[in-house]
Amino acid sequence: MTASSPSIRVTDLSYSVAGRELLSKLKFHLQSGEMLAVLGRNGAGKSTLLKHLTGELGKSGVELFGQPLRDIKPAEAAKRRAVLPQQTPLSFAYEVLDVVLLGRIPHGQRETVQDRAIAAACLERVGLSGYETRDVLTLSGGEQQRVHFARTLAQLHGVIGERVLLLDEPTASLDLAHQHATLRLARELCREGVGVLAVLHDLNLAAQYADRVLMLAEGHVIACDHPAVALTPESIRTAYGHEVLVTQHPCLNCPLIVSAS
């Protein structure tokens, strides 16, 4: 793989269930150090796409770090590709630090003092320093989501070479301040060379934080470009069936989307 090759490349990815096409000939890529936001209404194919990128629904049409996904052993992929699902329910009263330490499993069979230090540092990055011995089941939904975000940070920590982080609606259960804190941290990871793909519902968060947006409608790509190019009233109408006004944010160098009705 060359330095300019994508961390993820999707080529002619299609997927159907019971004769219904959920994804149709998708084609896009994710570069190292880039944040790509995946947008679209419910049922557009966002979660189905994410399950293909993880190999859950099949591995054809997807390359990871320049290799076909089907040729990469799961244990090797786990060292360099981390996934934050929208929901990660836990049934047992794990301590918070132990949950974060799950992210270190791909890197060795035995837990080390260094692993615990890494996990604690990752908790600090998500604003949960001091929560190490808390029962994860006593935390709010948003706090639990941040614990799992710390787990993905621990999973990618110290890895040499390309890394990818897949986020499925990472801001869904968070308040306003933590939505922005989470996406600012995602941007920090991009500056560290991580390729970040995030499924988002909030168009303005995507406009503010993403380098590019991939907009889906009924399993088709209708736009894949910089937010200022892709987020137009026409593309948003096609994707969401709703009229919007798109203007320039008064403080930030990005589009601002407001409802027209």
From Swiss-Prot:
Keyword field: ATP-binding, Cell membrane, Membrane, Nucleotide-binding, Plasmid, Translocase, Transport
Cross-referenced InterPro entries: AAA+_ATPase (IPR003593), ABC_transporter-like_ATP-bd (IPR003439), P-loop_NTPase (IPR027417)
Residues given in the record as ATP binding sites: G40, R41, N42, G43, A44, G45, K46, S47
Top-tier EC class: translocase
A Pfam short name: ABC_tran
The keyword Phosphoprotein belongs to this UniProt entry's keyword annotation: no
Subcellular location: Cell membrane
Matches recorded under CDD domains: ABC_Iron-Siderophores_B12_Hemin
Enzyme Commission number: 7.6.2.-
Gene3D superfamilies: P-loop containing nucleotide triphosphate hydrolases (3.40.50.300)
Mode of membrane association: Peripheral membrane protein
GO CC annotation terms, alphabetical: plasma membrane
Membrane-spanning intervals of the chain: none
Family as reported in the entry's similarity comment: Belongs to the ABC transporter superfamily. Heme (hemin) importer (TC 3.A.1.14.5) family.
Quaternary structure, from the entry: The complex is composed of two ATP-binding proteins (HmuV), two transmembrane proteins (HmuU) and a solute-binding protein (HmuT).
Physiological role: Part of the ABC transporter complex HmuTUV involved in hemin import. Responsible for energy coupling to the transport system.
Name the record gives this protein: Hemin import ATP-binding protein HmuV
Gene name per UniProt: hmuV
